[in-house]
Amino acid sequence: GFAHFFEHMMFQGSKNVADEEHFKIIGEAGGTNNAYTSFDKTVYHQTAPSNLAETMLWLEADRMGTLLEGFTQKKFENQRDAVKNEKRQRYDNQPYGMVNEILFKTLYANHPYEWTPIGFVDDLDIATYEDLRNFFLRWYGPNNATVVVSGDVNPEDVKIWVEKYFGGIQKCPDVRNVYPKKPQLSMDLYVTTTDNIYAPLTMFAFPTVQEFHPDEAALDILAEIIGGGNNSI
């Protein structure tokens, strides 16, 4: 859950940007910004008028390069509580909220996907300020990031701005691509759990192909036909 934790921390100010000012700068220009964490990545995204493109790159570079200069124990404690509350509100106390956690534990045993991106409260409780600081230094660097800029901008200008603002940021340790062995099911698995919910829920999960496989589109359509809406099978 540390990657998701940092999704929160990245909006709490850096050396040259005050707490919540990232939102303010973009919002006052009529833009929007947010972030999300999945199994494989954390994405920070913003949409704003094209004349703000350089400012957006500067904002991203400032928090990548100087976040720890605005990182305090108080902010750490506040955001730890925020993440725990988010987990309770969106998962623990929601009808069927724990279904995906149970599913991934079952389907991806002994694989990184066994752990959902939101993390676990027990891990958050024992996490320390130093743990989060070390996590940032290990993973947040220009050599482990992809910058995507699209819209009414001059590509040559963008290259200059990226080099200007990101070029001086210290690299994080080299990141090795790891491809864990895909879990294989030798038999059908059935899991039943009881919750304080009146209506039962049945979920079927079928291991298929990896992302971008030629069969992915057809399987997405099949999933929609089987269980994608009121007219599904």
Language model regions located:
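Zinc-dependent metallopeptidase catalytic helix centered on the HExxH motif
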Residues: 1, 215-217
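Buried hydrophobic packing residues in well-ordered domains
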Residues: 4-6, 44, 60, 83, ...
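Active-site SXXK
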Residues: 2-14
